[in-house]
A protein has these predicted regions:
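Glycine-enriched, solvent-exposed interface loops adjoining structured elements
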Residues: 1-192
Length: 192
């Protein structure tokens, strides 16, 4: 079942014994805390690991160097990052990986004429897989706990629990594709 941002926050609030919100616009401490913390926590969770379910790729649009502050002057080019960009996984062109680059204010600077970006994207909550939902709910509960319950002991417990859920989510995500095999390693060839 796909969960919305409100549903994720409400489940986290239930975990700590708080009243679940039905809207971020409610006039309650629960709604205010969820509204303020949720986007940052969601983006932080997405950025914390190269999630396969959130991996995207695209050719980047080259920016015109009209602003003197942005023009590197060394033959490098600026490329605009996509709006849903959260984390860079790799940068490539037709010649292979681009190893030297720099992120600058929603753009990437590199010496290539074209660039393919592999990245983690900000997705709609309904497209999160169940294992990520569980990890995000656990993290939200840990983050919401102290401001809503003022219990540092419970918050500490919930942070440990959220780390366990995060590890389980990473494992589940890693199992969503065939593992990379080392086929041409000299020591393996020597054993045969």
């Amino acid at each position: 079942m796909a969960l919305s941002d409100i549903a994720l926050c409400a489940r986290a609030q239930v975990m700590i014994g708080a009243s679940p919100v039905s809207s971020f616009d409610e006039d309650s401490a629960e709604a205010e805390i969820a509204r303020l913390l949720y986007p940052t926590i969601r983006d932080g969770m997405l950025a914390s690991y190269p999630w396969r379910f959130a991996a995207r790729g695209c050719w980047l649009a080259r920016l015109a160097n009209t602003d003197d502050d942005r023009d590197p002057g060394d033959g490098s080019h600026l490329f605009a990052m996509p709006r849903d960009f959260i984390r860079l996984l790799s940068l490539e062109n037709d010649g292979g990986k681009i190893t030297r680059f720099e992120l600058r204010d929603r753009a990437v600077l590199c010496s290539a004429d074209a660039a393919w970006l592999s990245y983690v994207a900000r997705l709609a909550e309904g497209s999160f897989p169940p294992w990520f939902d569980l990890a995000l709910i656990a993290r939200l509960a840990a983050e919401f706990c102290l401001p809503l319950t003022e219990s540092s002991t419970r918050a500490e417990y919930l942070f440990k629990r959220s780390e366990d859920q995060f590890r389980a989510a990473r494992l589940a995500d890693a199992q969503q594709s065939t593992p990379h095999a080392i086929d041409d390693f000299s020591l393996i060839s020597a054993r045969n």
